[in-house]
Every structure is written in C-alpha cells, then in structure tokens.
Regions:
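Pyridoxal 5′-phosphate
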Residues: 1-221
Length: 221
C-alpha cells in the first residue's frame, strides 16, 4: 500500500541508463494519476482492481520505446506486410494486439473508467485516505500486530499488509489467519502479494493484507 516516490525512482533509473517500468495496478484505481508526468517509460494497470472486468489491462508506454519492442504474439492485425520471404509488423499499438480483441472486457473497462471519472478520483482518494487512517489506528491497537510500510495514511493507498504474533511471541501464519477471518465473513489475503523480495527486505516470510476501496465503510473495517 505504500505510495512510492516515482519521480525520484525515475531519476535514479535514468542516471544508470535503465528503463523505468511502473506497475500502477494499485494506484490507478485509488489516486489521481497523470501518467505522462510520472517519469515512467512504461506503465501498466489492470481492470479488475478498478471495478472493471478481469482479463484486461492497460499498457502505456513512450512511443519511441514501443516502436523498438517486437511483438510477443502472432495473429491478425499485428502485421503490416507479409510475403514468402519476409514480413513487417504494424506500428504500435496494433503490433501488440494480435487476433480477436477482448471486446466485452474493453467495453467493461471503459465503463469502469467513466464511472470512476464521474465519481471524481479526488473523492475516491479522500475516501481511501479516511478509511485507511481508521484502519491503521484500529490495527495499531492490536497487541502483536506489526504494520508493514508507513503507518500514516498520507503515504499509503488503500491496502495494509501486516504480520501477527500471539501473546507468547509465536508467529500466526497469514494463511491460518486468512482462513479464520474467512470463516467469520472477513476477506483478506495471505501470502507474498506478488512481492516476495519485499518480504525478504522486511525480514518476514509472508503477510496478511487487508484492502479497502470506495465501497468500504468504517463498520466493515
């Protein structure tokens, strides 16, 4: 749930000649994001985390960089000229969209984007911050619970990862906690959350993550 300093990370990447790729799947649904101003060379996010359908996402990239990338799938619409001896590829983005597109998912993603725009991303972000602040204060009161990352809402999105120890100092495995909470009708996730190296950085095997969104109420927290 940490809000990362993208401009500083972009500067460091450029200083060593590296490409800067941003996974914004958690940020785009929750915060106003001006993609072009992030300093990213490539930025991606998914539909299902922003009240959209599964099976679709967005990749934004600098056009000059996209032109250098070869296609990763073959099929209709991604070629420019084909003969028996050679072929050339269509310019971006067509070269990356081979075959029949996910039409229903694209319509659903567009509807989700329109819905969030109508709500106002500033309003979504304000709600997220209020819910996250309430959750942080509630979690801090639990003995043996350790919050991973910043403990103030201004530096976080609507996700909080934590570990839990018993009063005897024994670690409660996130999968056990997840199953226990599930039996009480509470949905959390246990594991690495696609970030195993980060867990090693924090010195923990795995964690439990509670995620909040625009429909979450204080009573549910």
């Amino acid at each position: 749930g940490t809000v990362n300093p993208l401009h500083e990370l972009a500067r460091r990447a450029r200083a060593v000649g590296a490409r800067f790729v941003v996974d914004a799947s958690q940020a785009v649904p929750q915060l106003p994001v001006d993609v072009a101003s992030t300093g990213a060379d490539l930025l991606a996010f998914t539909g299902h985390k922003m009240v959209g359908p599964t099976g679709i996402g967005v990749l934004w990239g600098r056009y000059d960089l996209l032109e250098q990338l070869p296609p990763f799938l073959g099929g209709g619409e991604m070629i420019e000229i084909v003969d028996m001896a050679s072929s050339t590829y269509a310019p971006p983005p067509a070269r990356f969209e081979a075959g029949t597109p996910p039409i229903a998912q694209a319509v659903g993603l567009g509807a989700a984007a329109d819905y969030l725009s109508a709500l106002g991303m500033e309003n979504v972000a304000a709600h997220e911050q209020a819910i996250t602040a309430y959750a942080l204060e509630s979690l801090k009161a639990i003995e043996g619970l350790r919050i991973l990352g910043p403990d103030v809402p201004v530096d976080r999105g609507g996700a909080i990862a934590f570990t839990l120890d018993t009063l005897d100092g024994l670690e409660v495995h996130p999968h056990d906690l997840m199953q226990f909470l599930d039996s009480r009708g509470v949905a959390v996730r246990g594991g690495h959350h696609c970030a195993r190296p980060l867990h090693k950085r924090f010195g923990v095997q795995s964690s439990t993550r509670a995620s909040f969104y625009l429909y979450t109420t204080p009573a549910e927290v």
